[in-house]
Amino acid sequence: MICNRLWGDQTESSLKFFNISTEKMPWELIKALAQIKRVSAQVNYDLKLLDYERSQAIIAAVDEILSGNHKNEFPLSVWQTGSGTQSNMNMNEVLANRANELLRKNQINIVVHPNDHVNKSQSSNDVFPSAMHIAAVVNLKTKLIPVIKLLQKTFLKKSIEFRNIIKIGRTHLQDAIPLTLGQEISGWDFMLKNNTNHIQSTILDLSALALGGTAVGTGFSAHVEYAERVVLGLSKLIHHSFFSAPNKFESLSTCDAIVYSHGTLKGLAISMMKIANDIRLLSSGPQCGLGELIIPANEPGSSIMPGKVNPTQCESMTMSCCQVMGNDLSISLGGSSGQLQLNTYRPLIIYNFLQSIRLLTDSIKNFHDYCIVGIRPKFKRIEKLLNKSLMLVTALSSHIGYDKSAQIAQTAYLNGITLKAASIQSGYVTEKQFDDWVCPENMIYPDM
């Protein structure tokens, strides 16, 4: 023990030689390491590789950590050895020293060693990638996916609520034919359904654990039954069906499952960027922009312009999305840079992966609670813009042809007159025909 801390020499050495920046190993990863150590202690006892007293002392020490104690005992920087060995040893040292305290308290005169006992049947090279997968699965399932579904459910509700509000569509940021506000929002709803499916599809590969592969994937120094038993124990502890990776050489030498999974997080960030930017455009103005949506006025928008309401939730959301997209590049570079039997960019990769989950989870929750729930349509503005649009001329095209319809639209635009006036003036259409044919209500569904 060093200076009344539970860590030991290897942790202290890492603090000295890797005193870099402020990014620490994420607690989610620390927790996953602890869970592996807990189950390993039990499995090693069951396989008669570890005595009862030591195994129970290790388990008791782990349970203290899983209860939220001893967080200050894990101080290491992300910018350490690329295998995560120093964080694995940090965990081994803390558990060994705490287990020894518990044994002494119970007057049991034996010693728990960080390598010989806590790390038995393991290597940092199979423990750390397994902890990465565990942390990824748990945080995707319990944090990110639920908030995506929450937002998607609200979009579905809004799409039904606004299904009868007809508005002008826009392509290339130019006026297009009509659709309903509900139809527009239904696109956002379906984007999130797709994102959820894509993210969930990666959980199977993340459920493969490298444990039992030890140093290079051969399993040397691990009991032949260790891998299957430890995976079964982790599945019970975490309430998720993990399985032993079928090829340990792949699972040690690559981070492909994490790289692929983060690609779906980047996909979610892309979708959220589009949705947030759409809302910024639709709420712009409000008097001199599109102004079709009213967003909640959560806080003063300007220190100089009274009464200004800014789309701050959209801005926060899109900044988070930018960071996630940047994280994806870092993860891709790290994933592609492993050599031979081991990827040595793992701390970088899992730090960015878990940051992306936190950013998306928190941003989507805020975006939902403080923006989407309170969005309202500005009915008069929507109606005014719909009736002004020259693209309603598209309804005439099937009756008088494309060229004549285009001529009418150009005449209306150049002379500053209504589409109806230009149509009657052209002589191609009577007033009654215009009223019968140019009807936005009939332009929001396929032709019968």
Swiss-Prot record:
There are 2 substrate-binding sites: the catalytic A site, and the non-catalytic B site that may play a role in the transfer of substrate or product between the active site and the solvent. Alternatively, the B site may bind allosteric effectors. It is an enzyme of class 4 (lyase). It is found in: Cytoplasm. Substrate binds at residues 83-85, 113-116, 123-125, 171, 303, 308-310. Pathway: Carbohydrate metabolism; tricarboxylic acid cycle; (S)-malate from fumarate: step 1/1. One of its GO terms (molecular function) is fumarate hydratase activity. The lineage of its organism: Bacteria, Pseudomonadati, Pseudomonadota, Gammaproteobacteria, Enterobacterales. This is Fumarate hydratase class II. InterPro entries: Fum_hydII, Fumarase/histidase_N, Fumarase_C_C, Fumarate_lyase_CS, Fumarate_lyase_fam, Fumarate_lyase_N, L-Aspartase-like. Its EC number is 4.2.1.2. The gene is fumC. One of its GO terms (cellular component) is cytoplasm. Gene3D superfamilies: Fumarase/aspartase (C-terminal domain), Fumarase/aspartase (Central domain), Fumarase/aspartase (N-terminal domain). Transmembrane segments: none annotated. The active site is at residues 172, 302. Involved in the TCA cycle. Catalyzes the stereospecific interconversion of fumarate to L-malate. The record marks 315 as: Important for catalytic activity. It comes from the Bacteria. Homotetramer. Pfam families: FumaraseC_C (PF10415), Lyase_1 (PF00206). One of its GO terms (biological process) is malate metabolic process. Belongs to the class-II fumarase/aspartase family. Fumarase subfamily. Its main location: cytoplasm. Keywords: Cytoplasm, Lyase, Tricarboxylic acid cycle. PROSITE patterns: FUMARATE_LYASES (PS00163). It catalyses: (S)-malate = fumarate + H2O.
